[in-house]
Amino acid sequence: MRIKMLPIVAAAVLVAGTASAQDMVVKIGHVGPTSGAIAHLGKDNENGARMAIDVLNAKGVMIGGKKAKFELLAEDDAGDPKQGTSAAQKLVDSKVNGVIGHL
């Protein structure tokens, strides 16, 4: 599980490494089908991301000497490319540090 979380932590270090607050918030976006014909796949993927973030937050990950709090912002793309584009744009507008998903 550590190896699978390494890319998320590495991305967070690169993007959030210069934050000035005592505790920094690292926003991770997730886009996947949580409705529609393949909703079960998107929900499983999102639940896995939530579990990984819970583990990171429980461990108290430090980035650049500051405690990092990870947050998951999730959007439903219903397995539709147009909705996927819109969902991804919402996450960009929310200034997420990285995005996972898009099955």
Language model: regions and residue ranges:
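Beta-alpha junction/loop-to-helix N-cap segments that form part of ligand/metal-binding clefts
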Residues: 25, 40-45, 59-103
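Short N-terminal segments immediately surrounding and downstream of signal-peptide cleavage
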Residues: 23-35
